UniProtKB/Swiss-Prot annotation:
InterPro entries: Cyanase, Cyanate_lyase_C, Cyanate_lyase_C_sf, CYNS_N, Lambda_DNA-bd_dom_sf. CDD domains: Cyanase_C. One of its GO terms (biological process) is cyanate metabolic process. This is Cyanate hydratase. Keywords: Lyase. Transmembrane segments: none annotated. Its EC number is 4.2.1.104. It holds the Pfam family Cyanate_lyase. NCBIfam families: cynS, PRK02866.1. The keyword Lyase applies. It catalyses: cyanate + hydrogencarbonate + 3 H(+) = NH4(+) + 2 CO2. It is an enzyme of class 4 (lyase). The active site is at residues 88, 91, 114.
Amino acid sequence: MNREEVTDLIVTQKVKKKLTWAQLAEVVGHSKEWSTAALLGQMTLTEAQAKAIGTTLDLPEEAVTQLQVVPYKGSLPTAVPTDPLIYRFYELISVYGTTFKSLIHEEFGDGIMSAIDFNMDLTREADPKGDRVRITMSGKFLPYKTY
């Protein structure tokens, strides 16, 4: 059983058991954002976390073991995404990526925002014109070194 098959099984069991990502995050013991990334194959669970998820979702031992293996991160297809929601993020980076880069460099200097030392929070924001999605990302600034 590979990581993609484990992810498919997790999603199937989540739907079958009528669980939310937030409920599964409580089992994992981390934020819903990090836990969802882990359960979708992008992070590594500890043995205790993997066993707890395995019990909650009735996963086979092989899947529980696979959840403890460091995944190949960023393993989404490299083509332009076709899923409408994921494409909007692609579009957002295409339009605002140079703005993010310019403003971060102006504020912090030459470097990058870490996706390793990173936090994310996703919430619903009530709006009379239609609810909005609020995503807050916080990554440590890592300056490039000269040598």
